[in-house]
Amino acid sequence: MKTKAIFVIAAAAMVFSLASCEKIGPDEKPDGGDGSTSDTTVVSPGPSAGSDTLSGNVSGVWESGRTIFVDGHIVVPEGKSLTIEEGVTVIFSDAGVGVNHAAVEFSVNGNLYCLGTEEAPVRLTVAEELRTAANTFEGLWGGIVAGATCEEMLIDHTIIEYCGGQVIEGSPAAENGYYTAGDDAYPHITTNNVDGRYVITNSILRNGWSDAIYMMGGNAIIAGNIFSAIGYDGAEAVNVKSGCTVDVTRNIMFSANTNGLKLSSSDQSEVRHQAKIQAYNNTIIGSGWRRDGEKGGGIYVEENADAGVFNNLLVNCKFRATTPAWDEPGSEDCYDGEHSMIDYNYYASGTVESSIVFSGEYEDDGEMLLYSGVKFPYEGYAFNHEWYDAEKVDVHSVMARTAEEAASLDPKFVNFDLNMDPASYAFNDSWDFHLAAGSPALDASKTYTAGDRQPYFGTSGLEVNGQTYTSPAIGAWFGAFGE
């Protein structure tokens, strides 16, 4: 067995790795997964132009360096695979499909392998002239919808952007029962197979109306990614439901509208098992401020989710970890407080007032309530929120609750100033979220490393596309990176 490490230096000179074991032998399928070579779409260089326009069923290989224009829904059929090689740019039409202009959807009923590299990432995007700040939350195309028959998917060194078109009548996701027409918008990535295997790593998911990753089933490693400008009027960077077992680690989550992490076991049943999540060593920045009301803030755990949430570094978030109905154990809305461990996190705050502050009264289901009026992150951490489980959650966490504590607990990023508008969603590629020497967030004595909460896929890993990927080990520091 051949062993290799996958490294990334993304955006702000950030480095991480995932170990993988490449399987060499007669079972390896060089065509990308299903072993067949007939009835496929193989895009190869032509004599004149380095581009192609496609819609409908797609499979085979989109070869390195090509530009693919997509002007209608595309589908990887069940039993087929599509491999997108390094340097491929896929441009989705913003015109939509049909008389109702349904957002273009990338449906994956078979398997998908996006195999970018640090030097030549795969890019799923829109036309260059549409890649503007004004279109950050416009939802110009749909997103990837991995259906119930998608067995595996690898998203590696891939940029996915400007997603989030509305799901309407005629949208494949509505016709297939994954989303509701008129009520939902497309995430960047959706999963639906409780037995599926998904690895999303070294990638950038940005600029979208809805969630970045919405998991309704599957086993996943989500590691080493950058999420930024996620959600127009709601949404999370990573949203996990029942039927999922997931490791979420070493990610940067910047300006998720509501939360960096929403962990729920909603719709749990005999065929959709309890959601199990290990979320550790992530850096979550500026979550919750753009969400109307008091729901957003960074971490949200509900509805019987079994969650390990630890060694995360939350910076300039509106609130700390919230667990609705925490005082009603066993109720439908309460998280699995008996087995979960949401603790040993680090809450840092700048001292700049948010440009978005909700104060005064508001109506919720006919009831008049008061906004928190929180202006600074440290005020939100100190706020007497009804969803703070003071008995079990963040008991050992490090937390800035005053301006003075905010100054003393500055995590000292190599290149990121805490004293910026916490509601900002513009990501700067020069930022570096490594911790400088002497950072209090490097204090290993305050972290969690040796307990029962270990990565689900840290040893056995997940086999995808003939390789076994393992989750990174728990870091003895807070956040995605140490020094």
Please name every model-derived segment.
Residues 25-85, 93-110, 116-117, 121-483:
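Extracellular beta-rich repeat passengers
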Residues 1-7, 22:
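Positively charged n-region of N-terminal signal peptides that target proteins for export
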Residues 17-20:
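C-terminal motif of bacterial Sec signal peptides marking the signal peptidase cleavage site
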